[in-house]
């Protein structure tokens, strides 16, 4: 069975791989600087077709580069329902990365389908789906204690329908939920990532209340909910698991 050479007719990039035949087993990667490499599992969920899986790393600007981290193997074949591994290996040049904060990369994987049957009389549009997940390089100096929730250090202030999110930590904080309650996000809200020691603004739309539910993503990609009370100085409090 042959595979398409070059770019397919249509390329779709998605963040979580939810519609892809070949999917990674996680939605984010934390690479601890003390480790030589980190691994993730990929799976071909197709019952009938083999796929090629093409993997590479991009920096924060979306530029493809293997100068700091490299994905191995860069390309591999997965038979139907087969699983395999991709190793992300650090290069010696990672010593040049900041030691006082995380650095953001992206792991990308593009599935390449087999070429269509040439004997078919029907026109076929093939779509190559590309998964893209965040990869956080965590310096050796940053060590979270068991159960530590650095996300609760997020500093929030409210002015009208605008929330200012200030991250005083050395970690990337991803705010994936903002709502009046736990039943749904505010209309128009989009996930916000706040880089270490930086500030980002987000809009609350037509909602002018002072109480919110705010959800952040932990190291394992799980959504953790907090309550946010902005009567005076905004205060974050973790929501206890039910």
UniProtKB/Swiss-Prot annotation:
GO terms for molecular function: protein folding chaperone. It comes from the Bacteria. It is found in: Periplasm. GO terms for biological process: cell wall organization; chaperone-mediated protein folding; protein folding. Gene3D superfamilies: Immunoglobulins. Its main location: periplasm. Pfam families: PapD_C (PF02753), PapD_N (PF00345). Keywords: Chaperone, Fimbrium biogenesis, Immunoglobulin domain, Periplasm, Signal. InterPro entries: Ig-like_fold, PapD-like_sf, Periplasmic_pilus_chap, Pili_assmbl_chap_C_dom_sf, Pili_assmbl_chaperone_bac, Pili_assmbl_chaperone_C, Pili_assmbl_chaperone_CS, Pili_assmbl_chaperone_N. Residues 1-20 form the signal peptide. GO terms for cellular component: outer membrane-bounded periplasmic space. Coiled coil: none annotated. Belongs to the periplasmic pilus chaperone family. Could be required for the biogenesis of the putative YbgD fimbria. PANTHER family: FIMBRIAL CHAPARONE PROTEIN, PILUS ASSEMBLY CHAPERONE. This is Uncharacterized fimbrial chaperone YbgP. The lineage of its organism: Bacteria, Pseudomonadati, Pseudomonadota, Gammaproteobacteria, Enterobacterales.
């Amino acid at each position: 069975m042959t595979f398409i050479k070059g770019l397919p007719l249509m390329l779709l990039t998605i963040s979580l791989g939810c519609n892809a035949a070949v999917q990674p087993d996680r939605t984010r990667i934390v690479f601890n600087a003390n480790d030589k490499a980190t691994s993730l599992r990929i799976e071909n969920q197709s019952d009938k077709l083999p796929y090629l899986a093409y993997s590479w790393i991009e920096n924060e600007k979306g530029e493809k580069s293997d100068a700091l981290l490299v994905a191995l193997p860069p390309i591999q074949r997965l038979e139907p329902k087969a699983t395999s591994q991709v190793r992300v290996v650090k290069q010696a040049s990672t010593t040049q990365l900041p030691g006082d904060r995380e650095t953001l990369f992206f792991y990308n994987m593009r599935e390449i389908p087999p070429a269509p049957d040439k004997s078919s009389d029907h026109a076929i549009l093939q779509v190559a789906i590309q998964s893209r997940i965040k990869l956080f390089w965590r310096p050796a100096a940053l060590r979270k204690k068991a159960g530590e929730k650095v996300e609760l250090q997020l500093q929030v202030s409210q002015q009208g329908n605008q929330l200012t999110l200030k991250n005083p930590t050395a970690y990337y904080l991803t705010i994936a939920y903002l709502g009046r309650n736990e039943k749904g996000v505010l209309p128009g809200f989009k996930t916000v990532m706040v880089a270490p020691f930086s500030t980002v603004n987000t809009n609350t739309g037509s909602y002018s209340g002072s109480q919110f539910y705010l959800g952040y993503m932990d190291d394992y990609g799980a959504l953790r909910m907090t309550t946010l009370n902005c009567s005076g100085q905004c205060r974050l409090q973790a929501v206890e698991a039910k």
